[in-house]
Amino acid sequence: MLDLHQVIVSIIIGVIEGITEFLPISSTGHMIIASHWLKIDNENTKILEIFIEFGSALSILYFFHKKILRILKFNINVKKTNTKNLHILLAILPTIFFGLLFYKKIKLLFNTYNVMYALILGGIFLLISEIFKPKKYKTCSINDISLLQSAIIGFFQIFCLYPGFSRSGATIGTAILLGIKRSVAIEFSFIISIPLIMGASFYDFINNMHNFKILDLPIFFIGFMISFIVSILCIKKLLKIINRTSLIFFGIYRFIISGLIYFIN
C-alpha cells in the first residue's frame, strides 16, 4: 500500500519541478529547498528527484520535437543546413566535461546554503544581462546562431553545475548579452537542455542505484508523471512569460527567495 505522505511529497516536488524548470530561477535549487523544508532530504529523495527531472526533460522533448527533428535532419548541401549538430555539441560539451570531472564535488554543494548563494549570484547575472544587453538584436533566428555564440553559451552554462544558479538563466542571459533575440535565446536554451537533463538523470541514477528499491517505484512514477503533466500544461505559458518579462524581475525574485532561506534557516 502506498504511503500517503510519500505520495503527497512526490506530487509537491513534481509540481515544483514542472513549473520552475522553464523559468530562470533554478528548478534544482527549488527542489533542494522544498526537500529540506519538508524534511525529506534523504537518499530516497535523490532517486525521486531523478525521475521527476526526467519527466520535465521528456516534456521539453515533446514540446520541441518538430524543431529538433528539423535541426537533426541531414541535408546533403551543408550551406543550407540549419543549426547544425556542431552548434548543439559546442553548447553542451563544456557542461558535460566539467560535470563528469567534478561530479562528486558538485554533489557536495547540494544544500540550502549553497543554493542561497547561487540564487544571489544567478540573480546578479540576470540583472547584468538585462541591463547591458545590446540595443539591437544581431541574431533573430535559431538558424543564425554562430559557432562562436554556441561556444560562449556553452562556457557560461558551466555555472549551472552550481545548484541554484539556473541552467536556463545562464544560457538565456548569455545569449541575450550576445545579441540573440530573446525568443530565440529561450528556444535554443531549452533545446540544448534536453541531452543535458536526460544525460544527467541517467548518470545520477547509475550512481544512486544502490538506493533504488523496487517497492518505491510507484512513488517515483507518480513524481515522474506529475512533473511531465505539469510541464506539458505549463510550458507554453511559461515560455511566453519569460519572453515578455524582464530578467530583472526574475533576479529580484531570486534575491527574495535567498533572503527567505537565510532568515528561515
From Swiss-Prot:
Name this polypeptide is given: Undecaprenyl-diphosphatase
Provide the function of this protein.
Catalyzes the dephosphorylation of undecaprenyl diphosphate (UPP). Confers resistance to bacitracin.
Recorded catalytic activity of this chain's protein: di-trans,octa-cis-undecaprenyl diphosphate + H2O = di-trans,octa-cis-undecaprenyl phosphate + phosphate + H(+)
**Organism in which the protein naturally occurs:** Buchnera aphidicola subsp. Acyrthosiphon pisum (strain APS) (Acyrthosiphon pisum symbiotic bacterium)
Q: Which UniProt keywords apply?
A: Antibiotic resistance, Cell membrane, Cell shape, Cell wall biogenesis/degradation, Hydrolase, Membrane, Peptidoglycan synthesis, Transmembrane, Transmembrane helix
The gene name reads uppP
**What GO molecular-function term can you cite, just one?**
undecaprenyl-diphosphatase activity
Q: Indicate where this protein resides in the cell.
A: Cell membrane
List the InterPro entries hit by this protein, alphabetically: UppP
Give the GO terms filed under biological process for this record: cell wall organization; peptidoglycan biosynthetic process; regulation of cell shape; response to antibiotic
Miscellaneous comment: Bacitracin is thought to be involved in the inhibition of peptidoglycan synthesis by sequestering undecaprenyl diphosphate, thereby reducing the pool of lipid carrier available.
